[in-house]
């Protein structure tokens, strides 16, 4: 799909991971980490209990990814030969050159640099588009792994959405931290 910033969404290739287009052949890989309870620690909904729930989620992101203002990639581990997460751009505003970054990574790969490599690929790709200017993301304030990763990359904390998240499992509200990165923040 071609956008008005002169590019189309493409697969991105790193050292240990590739960001590949959505492909239902990897639904079992997605299901494998979607049934791990700790994966949902920083998500508002409960652990998937069946392959059908995973397929429903996959179909939902496929449907969104067909829109001009959204795209998801699957995070594919070259060494493990499997999908270990997803990363995407939402609410892409091609006129302003902005987008929201979203992501989810298998807990089996937390703290090992896979998210940082995925983040780098998406940021580099996005900021190489003409007219691109800013990326932003929301994360649980208590998600220190995510907060540290995006801060170390250069994202700046812009603010807090108080009690933004509502956990369906516990009915507990938590703050969301808002981070942003401008093209001008990237050191050449």
Describe the role of every protein-language-model region.
Residues 53-56, 62, 149, 172:
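A generic membrane alpha-helix/interface feature
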Residues 1-28, 33-36, 76-188:
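Acyl-donor (CoA/ACP) binding surface of acyl/acetyltransferases
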Residues 63-68:
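Short loop/turn motifs at secondary-structure junctions and domain boundaries
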Residues 38-60, 71:
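Conserved GNAT-fold acetyl-CoA-binding loop/helix
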Residues 69-71, 85:
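Generic hydrophobic, aliphatic-rich segments that mediate packing or membrane embedding
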């Amino acid at each position: 799909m071609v956008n008005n910033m002169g590019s189309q969404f493409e697969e991105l290739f790193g050292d240990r991971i590739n960001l590949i287009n959505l492909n239902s052949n990897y639904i079992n890989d997605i299901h494998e980490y979607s049934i791990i309870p700790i994966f949902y620690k920083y998500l508002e909904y409960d652990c998937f209990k069946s392959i059908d729930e995973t397929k429903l989620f996959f179909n939902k992101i496929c449907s969104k990814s067909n829109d001009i203002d959204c795209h998801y990639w699957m995070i594919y581990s070259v060494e493990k030969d499997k999908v270990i997460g997803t990363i995407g751009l939402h609410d892409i505003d091609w006129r302003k050159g902005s987008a929201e970054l979203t992501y989810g990574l298998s807990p089996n790969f937390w703290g090992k640099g896979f998210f940082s490599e995925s983040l780098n690929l998406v940021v580099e790709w996005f900021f190489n588009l003409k007219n691109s200017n800013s990326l932003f993301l929301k994360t649980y304030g208590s998600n220190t792994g995510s907060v540290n990763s995006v801060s170390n990359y250069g994202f700046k904390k812009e603010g807090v959405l108080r009690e933004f998240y509502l956990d369906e499992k516990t009915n507990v509200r938590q703050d969301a931290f808002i981070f942003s990165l401008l093209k001008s923040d990237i050191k050449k």
